[in-house]
Amino acid sequence: MPAALRCASVTAVALDDFEAALIPTGETDIFVRRAGSGPPLLLLHGFPQTHLMWRDVAPRLASRYTVVCADLRGYGQSGCPASTPDHAPYAKRAMAADMVAAMARLRFDRFAVAGHDRGGRVAYRLALDHPRRVDRIAVLDVLPTAEAWTRADARFALAFWPWALLAQPAPLPERLLAAVPDAVIDDALGGWGSPAGVFNDGVRAAYVAALRDPDRLHAICEEYRAAATLDRAHDEADQARGRRITCPLLALWSAQGPLGTWYEAADGR
């Protein structure tokens, strides 16, 4: 790893065999864990997780790829840059630029990327904004942000409460999450389809700790505010211009989750 990278001092609960680094990208620092050899593969997590969501998958992928598991800005051990009234520092466009810079510091100018949930949105924005950097892309449990808002109904609101709740003006969402971080994590991990026992105590504790950090709470809410405004506008602008992802793309979703029916509806248009 280049000497310019500043190694992070962390107590890991998983991925102990992966090298840890805190990479300066200009606007913030991005925490990564890296291992393996072969073509580079960037893995991006969702809410309310961190890079630890890949703890069971990344070691297997590292037998074939150079795997980089990153924390999005505002999440995990990455930096929490100050936001602005338009939430631009937490738009997926800014998060995608972080990943381009971080991978460049790791000397990867072109790479594959896979993202789940919020990370999937960063992944497809990365492929749209930086097509020469992305070799191929996989998105897991994701509809484009503009499409999700267009289709939003009562079922969506009840199943994906963070979308509208966390996008409310500060400080209400931050205060609500700060009051019951354990309940938020348990609902997210247990209520969104995870079988019992998948998340060990260390991983759960790491996720809860993030929601006890006021700066991270605000950053996460800013990311949702950006999704409801800037991210949606960026998607709509791309659609209006006919701008598309040009590299190979794999979209996967759970057959038993609500996204399944929405994908079927999209296919039927």
Residue ranges of model-derived segments:
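Flexible "cap/lid" subdomain of the alpha/beta-hydrolase fold that forms the substrate-access gate
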Residues: 2-21, 28-30, 40, 68, ...
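Recognition helices and adjacent regulatory flanks at domain boundaries
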Residues: 53, 72-75
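A short, Lys/Arg-enriched amphipathic alpha-helix followed by its capping loop at the start of a domain
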Residues: 56-65, 105
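Short, flexible helix/strand-to-coil boundary loops that buttress conserved ligand/catalytic motifs
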Residues: 36, 55-58, 79, 150
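Short beta-strand element of the alpha/beta-hydrolase
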Residues: 39-45
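Serine-hydrolase catalytic-loop signature spanning alpha/beta hydrolases and amidase-signature enzymes
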Residues: 48-56, 67
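Active-site beta-strand termini and strand-to-loop segments that position acidic
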Residues: 25-26, 34-35
